[in-house]
């Protein structure tokens, strides 16, 4: 099988409306009208964020997702195409509304989400099973979000196993607080990469120490690269059982504007590095550099992301 892609990003895609600034500590109905700096439409979800980061880093990238046959769906797909992302298997389906998120931000750049699941809620195992021929043409499949895919999570371990049998490596992204250890425990043996945030890992394991969280994932059968994203404290990685690497966070090249999509961008940078033959430490540093670029714009698609040089990484 000819390898056509470095990574296919599958799962949730949505249109994001970036709205702010708002006083998130004050009930919205206390003001009749809010004067805002921005109401900006862009694209979000792991499929949009990670695939755009990958494409801008020069990786051959495809998106595998589901949207409605509506204007927002057309907007979403056209944005990805403009970034050079292959959307040949990105479905628009009649009778569904494209998923959308209102990202409500305050003046300190903190945010909360108001999310309409829409088409993403209809994602089931057929999204992967019906496209295994396509996935077999890729080095990696990055799937997300665990915690927000109720129709696929009960059989997710079977889906990941089927992907690995094609020769494609697997990675899983999280959201929605991270979900629980079940059914993640069944999935970990079929993941080549799994790096949740510290908050997500705590929710999943009930533990507070990152090394203990990773040990819990290993106890569940994780054999690939496991780690914990720790924000400004960087990344704790375990490439193999018993080995730990601390990857420092990289200072953003300009002031932070919005942190939405930083975790997805980290995954994009990491997989971009691995697909071009970097060792895990160098690839993870590319991931942290990519995340640091992401936060300097209103969203991944609005950030002028260019490939960091070896010196910058």
Place the predicted regions along the sequence by residue.
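Conserved phosphate-binding/catalytic region of the ribokinase-like
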Residues: 1-21, 162, 210-305, 311
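Glycine-rich phosphate/adenosyl-contacting loop at the front of the ribokinase-like
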Residues: 1-64, 71-82, 253
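Conserved phosphate/ATP/ADP-binding segment of small-molecule kinases
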Residues: 157-169, 174-246
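Short, conserved phosphate/pyrophosphate- and ester-handling motifs at nucleotide-, phospho-/glycolipid
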Residues: 54, 197, 263
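A short, aliphatic-rich alpha-helical micro-motif
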Residues: 2, 132-136, 188
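Conserved N-terminal subdomain of the carbohydrate kinase-like
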Residues: 31-41, 56-143, 305
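Short beta-strands and strand-loop turn motifs
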Residues: 113-115, 140-146, 171-174, 195-198
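Glycine/threonine-rich flexible loop motifs
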Residues: 148-154, 205
């Amino acid at each position: 099988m000819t390898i056509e892609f470095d990574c296919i990003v599958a799962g949730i895609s949505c249109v994001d409306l970036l709205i702010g600034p708002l006083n998130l500590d004050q009930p919205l109905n206390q003001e009749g009208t809010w004067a805002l700096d921005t109401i900006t439409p862009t694209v979000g979800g792991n499929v949009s964020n990670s695939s755009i980061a990958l494409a801008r880093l020069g990786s051959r990238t495809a998106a595998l997702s589901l949207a409605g046959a509506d204007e927002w769906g057309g907007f979403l797909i056209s944005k990805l195409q403009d970034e050079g992302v292959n959307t040949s298997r990105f479905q628009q389906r009649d009778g569904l509304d494209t998923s959308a998120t209102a990202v409500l931000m305050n003046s300190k750049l903190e945010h909360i989400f108001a999310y309409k699941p829409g088409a993403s809620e209809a994602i089931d195992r057929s999204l992967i099973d019906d496209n295994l021929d396509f996935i077999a043409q890729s080095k990696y499949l990055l799937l997300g979000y665990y915690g927000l895919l109720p129709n696929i999570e009960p059989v997710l371990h079977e889906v990941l196993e089927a992907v690995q049998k094609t020769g494609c490596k697997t990675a899983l992204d999280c959201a929605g607080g991270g979900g629980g250890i079940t059914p993640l425990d069944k999935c970990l043996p079929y993941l080549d990469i799994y790096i949740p945030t510290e908050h997500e890992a705590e929710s999943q394991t009930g533990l507070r120490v990152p090394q203990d969280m990773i040990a819990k994932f290993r106890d569940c059968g994780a054999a690939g690269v496991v780690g914990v994203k720790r924000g400004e404290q960087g990344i704790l990685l375990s490439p193999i059982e018993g080995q730990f690497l601390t990857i420092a966070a990289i200072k953003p090249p300009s002031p932070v504007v919005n942190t939405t999509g930083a975790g997805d961008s980290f995954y994009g940078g990491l997989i971009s590095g691995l697909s071009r033959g970097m060792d895990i430490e160098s690839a993870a540093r590319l991931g942290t550099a990519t995340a640091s670029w992401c936060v300097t714009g209103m969203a991944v698609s609005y950030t002028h992301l260019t490939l960091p040089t070896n010196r910058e990484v």
